[in-house]
């Protein structure tokens, strides 16, 4: 595997150098324009915008109704804190002995291990669906051919997939730790549940300051729905000192207002986040598989039952190169959507122009608030929050 990776890397570098050489050799403006036209024409449009206008035109009569429903949904959704009132739950903690995955830098892996979350998963006493649907696990592909392979989740091997990305926020490079879980299925929670379907999951993202201390946590479904921000209590205190007053109709000082869209949901702060010696605790609901709340330290009263299991911390890269017979294949189709995980929600919301609404998808393809913003936009936090000066350390 290491040799194949090195060969691919070297070949890619050689191809890039050759292409850059051809670009540098262009001396005439017309030649540059021709090259640029061909270059941009070869770039496939992102799933974030692909076919949006066509879908709206094809479903024109329903567009006003769907857009009105979205506006109502955004305006009236509950935005406050929730309590993890679980009758029964199982706790999953990271396995400290997990070896560093190939291709992950040692320093990055140490950070991912250090802040790997504890997951408290609610269990229904008498679910109307198989109980394993409420357990996250390891993802695999099954079938005969790569293009028809079907994904499955092995709940006997609880696994959290993690990676680090970096963004410039307020003029400084901010490390963001991403942790993703996958369930076998989103069960039907009613007679008609448009969110039901194969594979379900959740992602949390922890933004660190220059001293590698957590400052805030973002939470989102793997399809891009239900995006929320949980700032650390210390960060909220800094916003209070910087701004003095809350904005109208806001509970927290750090909450911002978006003039051209929907304001972010910021339910509550996380006391002790910046000083927590290890990972946060996530409280995940049964059935819907939504994050209920986050704690810096798990309170014994918040965790019913006494069962606990270790989970494997794995590199997110594994999802993009899963073992499949004598080769490797991705969990995701070329458009970034999880294989065979269609939702009825996609059909219902197609008049809005959304591309496969509710369909779980790959990192860097998630849109939030009904495609209003890109989850991986470096300016996302500055768009939605009134960050205090130097929120992540020295900078602008």
Residue ranges and their predicted role:
Residues 1-99, 198-200, 211-396:
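Domain-length functional cores that host ligand/cofactor binding and catalytic or interaction surfaces
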Residues 78-156, 165-166:
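Charged, compositionally biased non-catalytic regions
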Residues 135-217:
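Short N-terminal edge-element motif at the start of the domain
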